[in-house]
Amino acid sequence: DFLQWVIHRLLHTNRFLWRFHKVHHSVTEMNFAAHFRFHFVEHFIYKGGLYLLLSWLINFELKYVFYIHALNILIGHLNHSNLNINYGVFKYFFNNPKLHIWHHSKSFPKRFANGANFAISLSVWDYMFKTVYMPSDGKLIELGFENIEKYPQTFVKLMQEPFKSNTEL
């Protein structure tokens, strides 16, 4: 999970990788389907590369990669849902919809210029590295990024956008 947190943070701080991850952040309404809005290149790097590396480093069978991936999809659906679930004290350990919606906020304070709440499953990494931002329950926040109204919305254009030479780095 920590490696996923690191990669997710890189997707926000590396300008080239952000081109691909930006597709995921082009949602303006949070629901479980937002979890599946991503660029295929990002998913290959983020999940494929990570799981293959882990299976090689730890030497576990490839079938376990699929189990982990299925669990991550389930957690991702939950965290991208519009459910107002209170985890109580467990919010410091497990990522949750109330925390993750702020990851998709259109605006952040200056100290979070590259975003916040990079947790995938365990929010403990964000608390540990001080990348947590959750000023309220997140029900009325604006999602996306600056100039999102100019960003493509069709599938083909979303897939082409990161490869354009004039795409903002």
Feature locations, PLM:
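A membrane-cytosol interface segment of integral membrane proteins
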Residues: 140-169
